[in-house]
C-alpha cells in the first residue's frame, strides 16, 4: 500500500521495459522489502557482508557482491531507500531538515527550508515532487551506464536526454556550441578562433598519446594551456573548462581537465545529439533503488528502519537497535551517515558542498532543447555580482522529468565555495536565473524578433545571447512564485571533482586492526559521502575499490552470466535505439500565503 509520504515506486508505476528481441514482453520489476513487500520479520543469523546505508555506492556494491555469490545483509536506519542519494517528497524533506538541525543526520548542517502553502494544503501535494539530495547527470559514455546495461538495472529505469549547457558571462546566458557544424556556422566566432577550437577538439580526443603537447603544461593550469598552446580566448576557455569539463575553478590541472573535456565530447552522439542523460522520477535515489532491487534478486536481504548499534571485531557480531544480532564473516561497510553512536573511526569530512534547491511555479521551457526537460547552467568565477571565486552550477529539471507537476520546475544550485560567501554566490546565481526567467516571460517578448524565433515546427526558441544582452537595462514588472526553497551544507571527504581512490579505503583498512576502547565502530570500513561532482563518475570507482577490499580482486565485478547472454551481447546495436526511445533577487519573490519555514530560512 502506498504511504502518504511516499511516491509511487518503479514497480508500482506503469510497466516500462527495454527489450533486445523483436517481440518484447513487459518487464516485471522485482519487488523490494519496505516498499511493495513487507520487511523481513527476522534478521539472518550469519552473513558474509553487512552494508549500512542504501546510497549509490553502497547499492552498487551490494548488487555486485550479491551477484558474485556473497550473502549480503543491506540495512538502512531510514524508512526509505537512498540515504545520502535519496529522492524525497516535500514532507520527507521537512522531516529530514528537522533531523539535520537536531544533529541526528551527520555530514549535513545549516538546513533551512521554506514551503509555500500551495504545497500540502493547496493545489499541489507533497508527493507531486521528488527532490534529490545529491542530483547527478549520467554521461552517455561512462562506467556506470555500462554497468546499468550489463546488470539490466537499466530495464527498471527511464531516461531523458540532456543537450543544453549554458554559460553565464557578462550578464549573458550563452548556449554551448556542441558540434563541428555549430562551430563553423556560429557567426559570433572569428575564423581563427574556429580553427583553433577545432584544432583543440581534434587533440583532446586522443590527448594522452600526444605527450609532447600537454606534458610541458602538466603542472600548470588548463587556462594557461588553452591560451598559450591553442590561442583560445576567455569565452572559449571558460566554456571548455566550466561548461564542458564541469570543473569548479581555473586552477584545475591540465591532465584532469583534458580527461573531463574528453568525457563530454566522446559522450556526444553515442545515443543521439546529446552528451548526457537524466533518469526520470529521480536521480541517484532512483538508480540506487534499482541496484537494490537487482541485489535482492541476487539474494541480498533488505531491512529498513534498522540501525546499527555496534560491531565487535573479535566476535564479528553486529548488534542492531531492536536487539537483533548477526555474525559477519567478512566485512562491515558503513555510510558515514549511518555510523553508530560512539563511533571513533568516521573519516574527517573536510570539504563543503553548499546546495540550494528551488521549485518555481513556471515551466521555464526556454532553458530546454526541443523535446527535452533538462538543462545545465554554469556560472564561472567572477561572473556574478557577488564576485564568486568558485563556479556555481545549476541543474534544471522540468515536468518531463516526472519530479514535478506541469507548470513547475526544479532548480538545483551548488558550489564548493567554503564558508559564508558560498550562500552569497548561490543567491547571486539564483537572482540571475530569476531575471532571465522574468525577462523571457514578460509581456511583449513574443514581438521581439531578435530574441524570439520560431522553428520549422512552430516551436519557440530563445536567442540566449540577445536575451542576456538586455539584462543590465531590464527591470522586471512581475515577481517570481517560489513554491519551495531548501538550503543546506553537505560535508564530504572527497575534494571537488576529485577521484575516489584506494588510498582512502587503505586508511579504513588500517582502522580495522586498530581497536579503540569504547568505540562502537571498531573493525568497520566507511564509504564516502557524495562529492560535489555533478556526474556519477565517482560511484563505480568507489564501489569497485570497496569490492576489491572485500573479495580480494575486482576481476569479477559485475561479471554476470544471465541465461540469455546472447541478448546482452546484442546490446551494442540495440541500446542506442532503446535509449533514444526512453529518453522519450529576494524582492522579486512572491510567496503566496504565509508558507511554512523549517530552520531559519530568510526569503
UniProtKB/Swiss-Prot annotation:
Protein's name in the database: Rab proteins geranylgeranyltransferase component A
Domain of life: Eukaryota
Modified residues (Phosphoserine): 470
Note, other: Present with 23800 molecules/cell in log phase SD medium.
Similarity remark: Belongs to the Rab GDI family.
Annotated keywords: GTPase activation, Phosphoprotein
Any Pfam family: GDI
Organism of this sequence: Saccharomyces cerevisiae (strain ATCC 204508 / S288c) (Baker's yeast)
GO biological process: endoplasmic reticulum to Golgi vesicle-mediated transport; protein targeting to membrane; small GTPase-mediated signal transduction; vesicle-mediated transport
One GO term describing the cellular component: cytoplasm
InterPro entries to which the protein is assigned, alphabetical: FAD/NAD-bd_sf, GDP_dissociation_inhibitor, Mrs6
Function: Substrate-binding subunit (component A) of the Rab geranylgeranyltransferase (GGTase) complex. Binds unprenylated Rab proteins and presents the substrate peptide to the catalytic component B. The component A is thought to be regenerated by transferring its prenylated Rab back to the donor membrane.
Gene Ontology terms for molecular function: GDP-dissociation inhibitor activity; GTPase activator activity; small GTPase binding
Amino acid at each position: 500500500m502506498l504511504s502518504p509520504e511516499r511516491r509511487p515506486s518503479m514497480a508500482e508505476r506503469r510497466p516500462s521495459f527495454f527489450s533486445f528481441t523483436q517481440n518484447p514482453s513487459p518487464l516485471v520489476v522485482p519487488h523490494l522489502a519496505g516498499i511493495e513487500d513487507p520487511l523481513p520479520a527476522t534478521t539472518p543469523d550469519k552473513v558474509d557482508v553487512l552494508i549500512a546505508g542504501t546510497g549509490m555506492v553502497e547499492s552498487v556494491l551490494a548488487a555486485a557482491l550479491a551477484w558474485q555469490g556473497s550473502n549480503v545483509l543491506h540495512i538502512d536506519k531510514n524508512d526509505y531507500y537512498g540515504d545520502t542519494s535519496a529522492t524525497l517528497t516535500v514532507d520527507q524533506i521537512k522531516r529530514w531538515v528537522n533531523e539535520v538541525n537536531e544533529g541526528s543526520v551527520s555530514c549535513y548542517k545549516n538546513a533551512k527550508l521554506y514551503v509555500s502553502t500551495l504545497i500540502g494544503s493547496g493545489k499541489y501535494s507533497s508527493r507531486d515532487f521528488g527532490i534529490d539530495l545529491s542530483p547527478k547527470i549520467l554521461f552517455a559514455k561512462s562506467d556506470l551506464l555500462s554497468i546499468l546495461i550489463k546488470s539490466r538495472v537499466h530495464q527498471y529505469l527511464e531516461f531523458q536526454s540532456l543537450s543544453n549547457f549554458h554559460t553565464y558571462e557578462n550578464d549573458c546566458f550563452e548556449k554551448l556550441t556542441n558540434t563541428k557544424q555549430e562551430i563553423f556556422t556560429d557567426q559570433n566566432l572569428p575564423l581563427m578562433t574556429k580553427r583553433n577550437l577545432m584544432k583543440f577538439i581534434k587533440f583532446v580526443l586522443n590527448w594522452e598519446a600526444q605527450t609532447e603537447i600537454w606534458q610541458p603544461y602538466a603542472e600548470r593550469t588548463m587556462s594557461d594551456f588553452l591560451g598559450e598552446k591553442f590561442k583560445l580566448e576567455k569565452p572559449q576557455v571558460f566554456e571548455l573548462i566550466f561548461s564542458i569539463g564541469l570543473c569548479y575553478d581555473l586552477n584545475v590541472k591540465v591532465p584532469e581537465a583534458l580527461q573531463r573535456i574528453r568525457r563530454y565530447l566522446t559522450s556526444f552522439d553515442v545515443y543521439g545529439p546529446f552528451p548526457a542523460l537524466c533518469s526520470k522520477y529521480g536521480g541517484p535515489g532512483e538508480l540506487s533503488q534499482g541496484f537494490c532491487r537487482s541485489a535482492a534478486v541476487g539474494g541480498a536481504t533488505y531491512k529498513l528502519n534498522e540501525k546499527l548499534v555496534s560491531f565487535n571485531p573479535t566476535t564479528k557480531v553486529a548488534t542492531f537497535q531492536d536487539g537483533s544480532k548477526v555474525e559477519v564473516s567478512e566485512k562491515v561497510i558503513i555510510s558515514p551517515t549511518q555510523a553508530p553512536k560512539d563511533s571513533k573511526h568516521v573519516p574527517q569530512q573536510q570539504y563543503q558542498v553548499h546546495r540550494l534547491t528551488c521549485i518555481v511555479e513556471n515551466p521555464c521551457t526556454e532553458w530546454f532543447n526541443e523535446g527535452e526537460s533538462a538543462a545545465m547552467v554554469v556560472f564561472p568565477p567572477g561572473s556574478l555580482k557577488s564576485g564568486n571565486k568558485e563556479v556555481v552550477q545549476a541543474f534544471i529539471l522540468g515536468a518531463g522529468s516526472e519530479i514535478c507537476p506541469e507548470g513547475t520546475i526544479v532548480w538545483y544550485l551548488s558550489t564548493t565555495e567554503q564558508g559564508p560567501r558560498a550562500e552569497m554566490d548561490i543567491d547571486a546565481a539564483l537572482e540571475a536565473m530569476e531575471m532571465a526567467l522574468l525577462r523571457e516571460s514578460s509581456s511583449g517578448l513574443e514581438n521581439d524578433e531578435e530574441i524570439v524565433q520560431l522553428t520549422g515546427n512552430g516551436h519557440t526558441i530563445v536567442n540566449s545571447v540577445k536575451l542576456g544582452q538586455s539584462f543590465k537595462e531590464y527591470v522586471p514588472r512581475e515577481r517570481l512564485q517560489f513554491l519551495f526553497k531548501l538550503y543546506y551544507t553537505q560535508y564530504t571527504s572527497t575534494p571537488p571533482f576529485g577521484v575516489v581512490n584506494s588510498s582512502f579505503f587503505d586508511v579504513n583498512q588500517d582502522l580495522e586492526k586498530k581497536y579503540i576502547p569504547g568505540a562502537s565502530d571498531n573493525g568497520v570500513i566507511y564509504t564516502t559521502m557524495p562529492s560535489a561532482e555533478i556526474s556519477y563518475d565517482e560511484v563505480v570507482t568507489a564501489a569497485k575499490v570497496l569490492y576489491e577490499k572485500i573479495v580480494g580482486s575486482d576481476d569479477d565485478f559485475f561479471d554476470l552470466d544471465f541465461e540469455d547472454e546472447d541478448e546482452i551481447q546484442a546490446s551494442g546495436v540495440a541500446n542506442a535505439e532503446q535509449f533514444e526511445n526512453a529518453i522519450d533577487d529576494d524582492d522579486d519573490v512572491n510567496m503566496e500565503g504565509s508558507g511554512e519555514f523549517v530552520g531559519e530560512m530568510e526569503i
